[in-house]
């Protein structure tokens, strides 16, 4: 919570004393999914927002997860079992605060998002703890091309706007991304980016794609890289264990993503793409649709 308080203080210092008022409610929703060797994780997320003025917005939401597990063995302290099947449930309720400035020189937004542990920890939908993520994004438009960059600090590795991760984590991390978007036509664009996640200290990983045993012994945590699961990469502990504590180097990640998007109107968008994690030696395809009405 000290991290969250510090973030709120910094945001308070950078807010302008006055801003042109443009208040109003908004409602948005999205449905997206990511598929890889561990299974398919999909998420639908309704969000209610309120614009205080042109620069400051708050929002609340609640995600719902749908997970199709692949038929791979899991290794924990209990005997291995098949992880094939389907699971669903709510994730962590969240509240966000966003400050943004748009001008000819630079577009900037700073977002603080807090989550409450309302999701099922045993299914990997929650860490069982309150989390905070402070992200800062910069972009500038050059005709049809818009480069962008982002940097943030959090105590969890969050899903991105287009990528639903196969795990939830608890531990201090920094996250970074840089890339660009090119407008092919008025409503069609292609994008690419490189990303990195740098962890600090031990990280607890909760898998969304490995079933937890119902027996008492199965709830014990494992040790990374000691199983005989589907993955040959010892870093992919989320494919072999439902919950485990790992050192920072296991949670570190870097890779590239590419996607295209279609926005027939300002209220509707669709995207699909591919992400390659170099650290995890992991390929993922993803998709998403979304809508937005109001301010």
Q: Can you annotate each of these PLM segments?
A:
Residues 18-52, 57-59, 65:
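Short glycine/proline- and aromatic-enriched beta-strand/turn motifs that initiate or cap beta-hairpins
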Residues 71-83, 175, 179-295:
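Outer membrane beta-barrel transmembrane domains
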Residues 55-60, 104-108, 144-149, 186-190, ...:
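Repeated loop/turn-to-beta-strand initiation elements of outer-membrane beta-barrel proteins
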Residues 32-34, 78-84, 119-124, 161-167, ...:
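Extracellular loop and loop/strand-boundary signature of outer-membrane beta-barrel proteins
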Residues 46-50, 60, 95-99, 112, ...:
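Residues on the lipid-exposed face of transmembrane beta-strands in outer-membrane beta-barrel proteins
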Residues 38-45, 70-77, 110, 120-128, ...:
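Outer-membrane beta-barrel translocator domains and adjoining extracellular loop/strand segments
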């Amino acid at each position: 919570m000290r991290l969250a308080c510090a973030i709120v203080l910094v945001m308070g210092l950078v807010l302008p004393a006055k801003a042109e008022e443009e208040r109003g409610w908004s409602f948005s929703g999205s449905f997206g999914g990511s598929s890889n060797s561990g299974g398919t994780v999909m998420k639908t997320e309704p969000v209610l927002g309120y614009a205080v003025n042109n620069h400051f917005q708050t929002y609340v939401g609640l995600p719902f997860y749908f997970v199709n597990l692949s038929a791979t063995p899991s290794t924990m302290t209990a005997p291995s079992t098949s992880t094939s099947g389907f699971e669903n449930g709510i994730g962590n309720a969240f509240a966000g605060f966003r400050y943004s400035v748009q001008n000819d020189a630079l577009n900037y937004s700073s977002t603080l998002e807090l989550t409450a542990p309302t999701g099922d920890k045993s299914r990997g939908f929650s860490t069982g703890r309150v989390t905070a993520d402070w992200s800062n994004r910069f972009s500038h438009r050059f005709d049809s091309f818009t480069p962008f960059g982002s940097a943030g600090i959090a105590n969890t590795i969050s899903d991105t706007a287009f990528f639903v991760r196969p795990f939830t984590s608890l531990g201090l991390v920094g996250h970074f991304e840089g890339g660009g978007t090119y407008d092919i036509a008025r409503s069609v664009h292609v994008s690419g980016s490189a990303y990195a996640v740098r962890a600090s200290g031990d990280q607890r990983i909760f898998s969304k794609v490995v079933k937890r045993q119902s027996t008492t012994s199965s709830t014990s945590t494992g040790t990374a890289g000691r199983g005989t699961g589907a993955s040959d990469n010892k870093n992919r502990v989320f494919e072999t264990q439902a919950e485990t504590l790992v050192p920072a180097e296991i949670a570190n990640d870097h890779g590239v993503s590419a996607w295209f998007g279609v926005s027939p109107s300002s209220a509707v968008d669709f995207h699909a793409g591919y992400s390659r994690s170099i650290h995890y030696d992991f390929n993922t395809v993803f998709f998403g649709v979304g809508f937005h009405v109001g301010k």
